[in-house]
Amino acid sequence: MRPVLVVDFGSQYSQLVVRAIRECGYYAEFASPSISAAECLALSPIAIFLSGGPASAYKDNAPKLDEEILNCGIPVFGICYGFQLLAQAFGGSVKKANAPEYGPADITIVNKAFFSGQPDRQTVWMSHGDSVIRAPKNFCILSTSQDAVLSFCNRDRTIAGVQWHPEVKHSRFGKHTIKAFLSSFAAPNWDPEQTICGTVDSIRKTVGCKRVLCALSGGVDSVVAATLTHRAIGDRLRCVFVDHGLLRLNEREQVEEYCSSLGLNVSTYDASDCFLSALSGIRDSEQKRKVIGREFIACFSKLQERFDIKPHFLLQGTLYPDLVESGATPGGATIKSHHNVGGLSDNLGFELLEPLKYLFKDEVRKIGLQLGIPKHIVHRQPFPGPGLAIRIIGEVTNKKLSILRAADAIVRHELRDWTDIWQCPVILLSDVQSVGVRGDSRSCGFPIVIRPVSSDDAMTADWYRLPYDVLARISGRITNEIPEIVRVVLDITPKPPATIEWE
């Protein structure tokens, strides 16, 4: 499949560029700014998108694209910094803006090249401190503001760019613009629901006659990965659900029940004592993730002996956002380790099989429904592999886990019908003693944080506006039913700047 390459220059929105292109029906993946023209041509891309970034295109140390790529005949579209790079490369002028623009801005379309059917005046999302003040010679100016060029293209419309961020939902017509550019060169080639056969074939070819051990978490990602792999290799897949003692209330029983209904051969391994012992005394969130990753691998080594299986591959439900946040994409910075990416030991003893690692959550859900997985499983709220360990701020103990499980169960019960909430982590601030009043007497206890968010893909998120009466009912139940908790607070921070999980 010919990709659209997204060269990532460090924009906070780069992942959204990939997602927006896929939503337009074209397969997209990241490429490093260091990619050479020869490497690029070998991939036979439909087009190349240049992302935004924090650098200034006119500075000597600014990251650049191999200029031979611009002469290869491959269509190129620049966004923000990428737009400024194109202006600089073709003889235009880029300078520090009189005033930086961050947030919504009004633009005027003066040429409909890629804006057919769009209003002449529209609001877009800006995030830049530099501006293109002169377009390259023989380029057509497509939109302007009072003192800057906001978009342009060359005469044959194969080189184009915009100063704003069409990938951000606040740019209402952004995806229309992206699709208008791409459709000039190729028909759509991406539908996640149509990739099932290709993924099954790829798994079959990769695995050959070997065996696969699945680290089943019970979430939609691992269930879809297991279902696809089972289609590919049948009973040579062995699924193991590791109870690490960090699960939510009754989660083990629920996972066993619905995995059985899907026909998956699942064995449960209780490793809670091992995990809790390894986590003893650890307060740092990154260290928790690393320890949990190592313990998982240790578990799988023991499982080979217990169940007399000698798998070559370890199957995981790693997704594209996991790779991005772990810095595993070209040029990516590490935001936090994921137990199924950066938290794994270098000496696995297994070869990783990650059939979903280039997919977003919504794409996995579409595939899950196509596979016939029940809707309530497909739309289950995401739950991190390290479980409640990263929702306890401080050391993890059995007592704290019991408190958090009870609070989490209350929140999930009260929000069971709120299907448009992407996720609602419940966090125990176990290193904080908060003062309360009970029975006319002073009391002390833990604060609990609830964090309901709305999102499309977990790359960005906004806090969910729950009605006050729902919040009051949640707070009342938690403080009345769990004596160790004296305070309930609401996290109203979007992502960015905060991640969805606290740790």
Curated annotation (Swiss-Prot):
Under Gene Ontology molecular function, one entry of this record is: GMP synthase activity
Q: What general EC class does the enzyme of this chain belong to?
A: ligase
Source domain of life: Bacteria
Q: Does the keyword Ligase apply?
A: yes
Q: What sequence ranges are listed for the domain Glutamine amidotransferase type-1? A: 3-189
Q: Name residues in a coiled coil.
A: none
Stored CDD domains: GATase1_GMP_Synthase, GMP_synthase_C
Reaction catalysed by this enzyme:
XMP + L-glutamine + ATP + H2O = GMP + L-glutamate + AMP + diphosphate + 2 H(+)
What positions does UniProt annotate as the active site of this protein? Answer: 80, 165, 167
- Listed pathway(s): Purine metabolism; GMP biosynthesis; GMP from XMP (L-Gln route): step 1/1
Residue ranges annotated for the GMPS ATP-PPase domain, each copy included: 190-380
The record's EC number reads 6.3.5.2
Record-annotated residues binding ATP?
217-223
Indicate yes or no for the key word Cytoplasm.
no
Q: Which UniProt keywords apply?
A: ATP-binding, Glutamine amidotransferase, GMP biosynthesis, Ligase, Nucleotide-binding, Purine biosynthesis
Task: Give the record's subunit note.
Answer: Homodimer.
Database matches in NCBIfam families: guaA_Cterm (TIGR00884), guaA_Nterm (TIGR00888), PRK00074.1 (NF000848)
Instruction: Describe the function of this protein.
Output: Catalyzes the synthesis of GMP from XMP.
- This protein is called GMP synthase [glutamine-hydrolyzing]
